[in-house]
């Protein structure tokens, strides 16, 4: 058990870290070999924890020694000298950290195992040759070894290369995961070189590189044959090398590119390295540690293979390789351009496109962007249009590598065919036999090798790959977009390439996620200006049918059902990529109801581009994620003069927010320009004061015809006040919902009251939910209701109203001029004490027909008071919802008596109440001819045959009565379904 002193010390240390430092601490923590209990803890809990909570998690899941070592080593790695000294002084026994001076795995047995004569020299000679080749092929466009620093940042998380990592009895399995092109393979190869570096290790160590791209082409073999294929000179030494497994590092590169049927990696696994097996079986045996269990493993993969890997790897350590972070990209631009102004302008252009900026984490994409924009700037061209879309940038890069009028039509067709065939086959590396099968000559590729579109493997000269996966996707889209020659296979069936409809189908994309971005690029190539640019350079023409094919596919997508949020996001992204207004008009024309979830500024831009053409749109549901707008920032004005004077001098975060607000302004114009838009829902949204004001500005305009508005769970709290202010005097508004767990401020109450008392107010439905108001505020609100003549339906569900507040409302409703017809007080913390005054309302009210008291513990006494009101001849109540109100048998007796007296009640909800035998008493009323009840909702009684039979008899005697017994617990329908 961890000592209280250690827990207190750890908490004190962690609480001194700022937000960024705590985030770094967690990242470094992940690189440590976690103990079993901590390893099973959901990492999301660790990510969300503050310093105090993180300390609690660690002391509850890890041993004292582990906590001491990990804390001191991580603080030292973060260069937090003072905190590190404090940790050593307070936490360490004997004042020492248990560090590992020798980074090797294994134990004393390793040192006693000697290599054969000549084996050591032969292995190191081979590795030195390999090292020279790898070091020359790591990065595209490297500047002053810039990428080495980025790689080293990730390399320190590899535990078997970190001398400070605590010794582990079992060997490590490390998984490097991340998107394509961010440097996973480079990092893995550098780890191999460091593992075998004679300067770092006094004993001989071995490393074997297993490329899954290559292994997919191999037939059955033994494991010894598998690893010796690249080392023929060491073939005789393989048995003695494998006998020293604790000295071996295996790198399994690109697990996601291993083409195997589901489950192939976990079938027929074996531990005999001399036995011939299919390559997937050998890899599965290695990962499951059936084969050479004492070896260290380093696996690289894209995220899509992580789920399968979890079934194979034994207690893996996951290291996310992120490539270039934002600061890396900025530094890269500065080095590439040389001129700071040009570099920062280009960098801001890339950052303005979220999709392009995300791709920029790959060094190759950063190089493409820099190369393209620098050339444009040198020519005096405006680079802004180029960065609007990824298609525009990639097309400009492609055309810039060749002179205009080069007439390379055939060569470009060949290249696009190669890209498409590879993408459909989920293949990124092409061998000579692949080229031969497609009828491609290696000489056909020379131009694109020289233009840095393709790369040739310096080790295997007959292997080719594209500069980046995204560029292969772009060229695949080009395959579909180019006009085909007479007699040419239009859809590529001869090469197992799907047609456009198949490309855009959800089924194919699930099997091959790389196809998704091809659709975006294909829309981008449907642009007329881009078609002319391509024709001017290569002499190629775009197919006149491609735009129509895209329209047909998208029409089919939402022909029979409304689009999901994800599908809509993709459609809008594709339309923006096209930059074709006419195309957007045709695609969005059928939309009448849509739901949007905005997660970044690019999505705001996509929506504003297309939805302004959606003139038949009637309902819009909007959700804005945290981070789209910045909080707690200086309130900058948006006038043009301000931006011209200060744009380059204000902080980056403010500049980014200014851009977000400009795009948001364009998006919000939809509310004042579309006369058919009647319903707006804003829910679970993180807005800012400025973004709320912009939205309200468009809502207040006379050209906005919104009738129904729902604002639910929105921040900041002041947004509710601003919306109330915007709706004052809004004639068209008939339904308003303001829900969310917020504290009412006086100004918001004033705005809401002004809205209700305004002579133009036509509000018929008002819902207030989750508000904490004082009795004085409720009194002010209910006082205003006296003067309002339009409001018919009031829902105060989930408010802290209490009996005191409810009685103030009932007092208002006993006045002869109140107009409320429907009242919901669900979950307002009411008791039987308020029901006597409510009964008086039932007696005198000529308007009230619907009443909901669900989830209030009024009990049988409360029901008694209500039934007294129901029994009066002048009572007009038709629907009464008493779901989950603590009603028992006695309450059923009161209800039965009221129903038999021919009261006006036609709908009654008693679900989620333990009425037990009270049901028999209630059934007496249901069989009485004076009972007017038509719909009764009860708790589920499927398992009670006696009650089931009783209800069937009641239905036979009263065929006009509907009894709903499917309303219990979590499956109970919402009260509002029954109430309206």
Swiss-Prot record:
Family to which this protein belongs: Belongs to the NLRP family.
Molecular function terms from GO: aspartic-type endopeptidase inhibitor activity; ATP binding; caspase binding; identical protein binding; interleukin-1 binding
Binding site for ATP: 178-185
LRR repeats by residue range: 614-638, 674-697, 760-784, 788-810, 817-840, 845-868, 874-897, 902-928, 933-957
Bias (Basic and acidic residues) ranges: 113-123
Gene (UniProt): NLRP7
SUPFAM superfamilies named among the record's database cross-references: DEATH domain, P-loop containing nucleoside triphosphate hydrolases, RNI-like
Induction description: By bacterial lipopolysaccharides (LPS) and IL1B/interleukin-1 beta in peripheral blood mononuclear cells.
Domain NACHT: residue ranges: 172-491
Effect of substituting residue 799 to T: In HYDM1; uncertain significance
Annotated region described as Disordered, given as residue ranges: 104-123
SMART domains linked: LRR_RI, PYRIN
Name the UniProt record assigns to this protein: NACHT, LRR and PYD domains-containing protein 7
Disease: Hydatidiform mole, recurrent, 1: A disorder characterized by excessive trophoblast development that produces a growing mass of tissue inside the uterus at the beginning of a pregnancy. It leads to abnormal pregnancies with no embryo, and cystic degeneration of the chorionic villi.
Role description: Inhibits CASP1/caspase-1-dependent IL1B secretion.
């Amino acid at each position: 058990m961890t000592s209280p002193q250690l827990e207190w010390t750890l908490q004190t240390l962690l609480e001194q870290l700022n937000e960024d430092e705590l985030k770094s601490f967690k990242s470094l923590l992940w690189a440590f070999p976690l103990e079993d209990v901590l390893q099973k803890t959901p990492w999301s809990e660790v990510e969300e924890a503050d310093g105090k909570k993180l300390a609690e998690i660690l002391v509850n899941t890890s041993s004292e020694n582990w906590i001491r070592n990990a804390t001191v080593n991580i603080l030292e790695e973060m260069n937090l000298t003072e905190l590190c000294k404090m940790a050593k002084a307070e936490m360490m026994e004997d004042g020492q950290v248990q560090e590992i001076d020798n980074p090797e795995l294994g134990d004393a047995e390793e040192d006693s195992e000697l290599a054969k004569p000549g084996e050591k020299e032969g292995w190191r000679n081979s590795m030195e040759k390999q090292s020279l080749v790898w070091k020359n092929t790591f990065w595209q466009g490297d500047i002053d070894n810039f990428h080495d620093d980025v790689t080293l940042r990730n390399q320190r998380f590899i535990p078997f290369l970190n001398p400070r990592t605590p010794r582990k009895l079992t060997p490590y399995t490390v998984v490097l995961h991340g998107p394509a092109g961010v440097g996973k393979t480079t990092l893995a190869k550098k780890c191999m070189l460091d593992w075998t570096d004679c300067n770092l290790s006094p004993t001989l160590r071995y490393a074997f590189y297993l490329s899954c791209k290559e292994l997919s082409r191999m037939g059955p073999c033994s494991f010894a044959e598998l690893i010796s294929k690249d080392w023929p000179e060491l073939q005789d030494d393989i048995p003695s090398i494998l006998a020293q497994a604790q000295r071996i590092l295996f790198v399994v590169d690109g697990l996601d590119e291993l083409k195997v049927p589901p489950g192939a990696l976990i079938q027929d696994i074996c531990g005999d390295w001399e036995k011939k097996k299919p390559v997937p079986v050998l890899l599965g045996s290695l990962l499951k540690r059936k084969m050479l269990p004492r070896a260290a493993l380093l696996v690289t993969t894209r995220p899509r293979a992580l789920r399968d890997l979890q079934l194979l790897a034994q207690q893996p350590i996951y290291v996310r390789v992120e490539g270039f972070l934002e600061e890396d990209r900025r530094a890269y631009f500065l080095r590439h351009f040389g001129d700071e102004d040009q570099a920062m302008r280009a960098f801001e252009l890339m950052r303005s496109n979220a999709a392009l900026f995300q791709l920029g984490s790959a060094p190759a994409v950063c190089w493409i962007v820099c190369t393209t924009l620098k050339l444009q700037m040198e020519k005096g061209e405006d680079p802004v249009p180029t960065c609007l879309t990824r298609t525009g940038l990639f097309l400009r890069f492609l055309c810039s590598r060749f002179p205009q009028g080069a007439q390379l039509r055939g060569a470009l067709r060949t290249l696009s065919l190669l890209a498409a065939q590879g993408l459909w086959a989920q293949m990124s590396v092409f061998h000579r036999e692949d080229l031969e099968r497609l009828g491609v000559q290696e000489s056909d590729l020379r131009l694109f090798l020289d233009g840095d579109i393709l790369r040739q493997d310096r080790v295997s000269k007959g292997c080719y790959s594209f500069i980046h996966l995204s560029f292969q996707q772009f060229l695949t889209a080009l395959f579909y977009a180019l006009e085909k020659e007479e007699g040419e296979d239009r859809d590529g069936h001869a090469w197992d390439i799907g047609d456009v409809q198949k490309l855009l189908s959800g089924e194919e994309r699930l099997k091959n996620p790389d196809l998704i971005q091809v659709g975006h690029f294909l829309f981008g190539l449907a642009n007329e200006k881009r078609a002319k640019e391509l024709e001017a350079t290569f002499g190629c023409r775009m197919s006149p049918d491609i735009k129509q094919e895209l329209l047909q596919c998208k029409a089919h997508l939402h022909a029979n059902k409304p689009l999901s949020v994800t599908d809509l996001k993709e459609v809008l992204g594709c339309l923006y990529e096209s930059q074709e207004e006419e195309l957007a008009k045709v695609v969005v024309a059928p939309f009448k109801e849509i739901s949007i979830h905005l997660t970044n500024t690019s999505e705001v831009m996509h929506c504003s581009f297309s939805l302004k053409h959606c003139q038949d749109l009637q309902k819009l549901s909007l959700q804005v994620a945290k981070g789209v707008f910045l909080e707690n920032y200086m309130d900058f004005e948006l006038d043009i003069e301000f931006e011209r004077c200060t744009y380059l001098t204000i902080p980056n975060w403010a500049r980014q927010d200014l851009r977000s607000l400009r795009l948001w302004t364009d998006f919000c114009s939809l509310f004042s320009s579309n006369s058919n838009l009647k319903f707006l829902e804003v829910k679970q949204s993180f807005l800012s004061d400025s973004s709320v004001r912009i939205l309200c500005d468009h809502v207040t305009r006379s050209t906005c015809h919104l009738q129904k508005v729902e604002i639910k769970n929105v921040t900041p709290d002041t947004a509710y006040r601003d919306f109330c202010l915007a709706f004052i005097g809004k004639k068209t508004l008939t339904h308003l919902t303001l829900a969310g767990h917020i504290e009412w401020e006086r100004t918001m109450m004033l705005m809401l009251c002004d809205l209700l008392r305004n002579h133009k107010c036509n509000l018929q439905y008002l819902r207030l939910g989750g508000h904490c108001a004082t009795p004085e505020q409720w009194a002010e609100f209910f006082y205003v209701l006296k003067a309002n003549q339009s409001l018919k339906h009031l829902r105060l569900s989930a408010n802290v109203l209490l009996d005191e507040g409810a009685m103030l409302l009932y007092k208002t409703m006993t006045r002869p001029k109140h107009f409320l017809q429907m009242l919901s007080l669900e979950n307002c913390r009411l008791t039987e004490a308020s029901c006597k005054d409510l009964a008086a309302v039932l007696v005198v009210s000529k308007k009230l027909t619907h009443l909901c008291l669900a989830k209030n513990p009024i009990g049988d006494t409360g029901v008694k008071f209500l039934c007294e009101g129901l029994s009066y001849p002048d009572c007009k109540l038709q629907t009464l919802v008493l779901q989950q109100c603590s009603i028992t048998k006695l309450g059923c007796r009161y209800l039965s008596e009221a129903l038999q007296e021919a009261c006006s009640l036609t709908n009654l909800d008693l679900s989620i109440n333990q009425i037990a035998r009270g049901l028999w008493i209630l059934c007496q009323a249901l069989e009485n001819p004076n009972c007017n009840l038509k719909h009764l909702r009860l708790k589920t009684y499927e398992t009670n045959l006696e009650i089931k039979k009783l209800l069937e008899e009641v239905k036979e005697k009263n065929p006009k009565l509907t009894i709903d017994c499917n309303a219990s617990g979590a499956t109970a329908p919402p009260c509002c379904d029954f109430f309206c």
